[in-house]
Amino acid sequence: MITTEIKRVKNHINGEWVESTGTEVEAVPNPATGKIIAYVPLSPKEDVEKAVEAAKAAYKTWSKVPVPNRSRQLYKYLQLLQENKEELAKIITLENGKTLTDATGEVQRGIEAVELATSAPNLMMGQALPNIASGIDGSIWRYPIGVVAGITPFNFPMMIPLWMFPLAIACGNTFVLKTSERTPLLAERLVELFYEAGFPKGVLNLVQGGKDVVNSILENKDIQAVSFVGSEPVARYVYETGTKNGKRVQALAGAKNHAVVMPDCNLEKTVQGVIGSAFASSGERCMACSVVAVVDEIADEFIDVLVAETKKLKVGDGFNEDNYVGPLIRESHKERVLGYINSGVADGATLLVDGRKINEEVGEGYFVGATIFDGVNQEMKIWQDEIFAPVLSIVRVKDLEEGIKLTNQSKFANGAVIYTSNGKHAQTFRDNIDAGMIGVNVNVPAPMAFFAFAGNKASFFGDLGTNGTDGVQFYTRKKVVTERWF
């Protein structure tokens, strides 16, 4: 339940809410108002060690629970999430700032991830081949790996944790969760509902905090695997440090997602698609469209319509259903984004829609409106860097080949989209683009939970992505058995 009182956030270890053993805390503001809504502990190493010990103890029995029973337990959790969808969405809007519409969509995507986890009995099935040699049978069996951990970002405080711990737990592991210190309240509610569903103590543990918690997770010898979603520099650090310490690591990193707009596209739907991808959730998502490569033949018409429609978007508190763009997560991030907009102007790009100039009614929140640049090139920081904001760069290209070449020049390769009505164009794009997730007339090509989620190049460090069969393989180890009976 959402209240107006300032909350002091706790950790959840071994089935109980406990104060951090440390004394350092960080204020959590509502991004739409700047007012403090909570204080979150910056937990020390000792709290992580306690959480790992609890998870180790729980693993001894949880890993032995029959797979269908674990699945049934998750069904109870799934039901509770569905029953509390409205409350969960409101918590997201309160502490993250995204509009209630966007938050509601996130809640549904998180629920879909839990639906995948309930199907673990099917996904964990092994393989067998009888009579591989005279009187000898061969088979592959999947087993849980032990205590695993997840480190998640602020921008999807429900969906991304639910990519991780339900599937890991369904596979028989126990879990230590470290969510962003910027959005601790939703994490609390997810854990409350988890134990309300009747799970044994210690199966899921929540440690709030910052860098010290991350480092403690990466260094703890009893944690077998780490899942991470966040920025490219931190993802690289998590991958290198975790693997150096003998852990299995999947680290989903930054992005600079491109869309190629072809002359044969459906103009109206393409414009609305680009707006939704670039500006919804205030652009704070790793699958947001941040660069449009538009073919010269349609460029002027596309840009005219895009600019006109973008100028209609309202900016403000996410609880107001008339608003399309909510606040950014923090004042410091707002200042960083304004710096990028200023650099684009200084570098010679044409500012078609200026998000620095927004209505005064938005108040004291961390607001930047939808922003569009034209005349952008690959030498500009606004093309090169992940800005993580409602800032869109337009590059004009002569044809599909140049659009693909431009897209592949980015160091990132998370998602990419083509807008076209030509199947051959779509096929050429699919076969030649570097991105790990590709959309054809799909604005945000983030796959459903039963498909793997992972980019390429500097957008992903590791081998197996989250979700789908990749997720099951990541959270299990296989044993190959060759047997003969006399």
UniProtKB/Swiss-Prot annotation:
GO-annotated molecular function: malonate-semialdehyde dehydrogenase (acetylating) activity; methylmalonate-semialdehyde dehydrogenase (acylating, NAD) activity
Keyword NAD attached: yes
Record's keyword annotation contains Oxidoreductase: yes
CDD domains, alphabetized: ALDH_F6_MMSDH
Residue positions of the active site: C286 (nucleophile)
Top-level enzyme category: oxidoreductase
Record note on quaternary structure: Homotetramer.
PANTHER family per UniProt: MALONATE-SEMIALDEHYDE DEHYDROGENASE
Similarity section: Belongs to the aldehyde dehydrogenase family. IolA subfamily.
Protein name: Malonate-semialdehyde dehydrogenase 1
Species annotation: Bacillus mycoides (strain KBAB4)
